[in-house]
Every structure is written in C-alpha cells, then in structure tokens.
C-alpha cells in the first residue's frame, strides 16, 4: 500500500481508499467496496497495523446526476491509539457534496467558459456550486498544482500526486490530514 507521512498524533486523519475513476460514485458502490476490503490490511496513521475496527457511521450527501444521494460513511477506531478515522473513496472530496471528477470538470470547463455542459450532465450542480469550486481552486489549489507540475487531465496521477505532495485529496479545503491507500482489495 501507499501512504503519506502524517503525524502520529493526528486524531482527525481521514483514510482514503483509491478507486478507479470509471467506478460509479453511489452508496451501493461505496458499501460494496467497503465490504471487499479487509480492515486489518489498513494501518492507522499512528503506525499500527491490524488494529482498526468499525466504530460507527455518519451520513453525508453527494450531488450526482440521479440527485443528492445519502452515503453512510464508515468510521473506524484504532485499538492502539484510540483515534477514529473516516473511510472515504478517492472519488470523494472531503467536506464536499460534489465528486472529485465533477470538480475537475468544472475547473476544466471554466477555461473554455462552458460551465453549462457540467451543469447539464449533473443537474444537482448549479452556478453557485461552480463559483464556489472555482473560487476555492484559485484560492487554495491552482498555484499548488502548478508548482508541482500536476496535470488535471489524468485522474489517478492527480490523486496520487496531491496525496504525495500535500497529504490531501485534490480540492480538499480543510487542512485535516488524509492518507491514501492503493490496492486495498
């Protein structure tokens, strides 16, 4: 697996599991993917392996072409350090209701001034969402990805480079630490 360095004292660290971009971002896929992973294969940010156990769930929504879908996000707890961690998929952006691929499409569409194509393909996304994403991109991410020469057009590369360079998912705004696991199944 691939992880980035995170302080062992980070209690709010998220754990992100890599999924290929062609997988659907639906509650059914999230639940299916989680059912296929072995929690003992994941290591806690404190450094211990085999110590994560299901602690609970919380609800979060993602805006999709099918509407605003509710997800039950898994939280795990480390028996060694006692910290809890949310388990997300790499197609999700922490603290956002808009998927990573939709956010990248909005950023790319802004270059051609054609945001209507994104809003047409996902009617749950409106102009206000687009403005918010573009403002956050310009404020928090544009210079960062330019400085590391990270292209937007290759999703797997974008994800892995942002975790390697910044210990965050692309477009994650809050500075909560986040680690990426590859090849979890």
Where are these regions (language model features)?
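Long C-terminal interaction/binding lobes of large macromolecular proteins
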Residues: 1-25, 39, 83, 143-185
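Short, conserved DNA-binding cores of transcription-related domains
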Residues: 1-92
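Short, positively charged, Gly/Tyr-enriched micro-motifs
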Residues: 80-170, 181
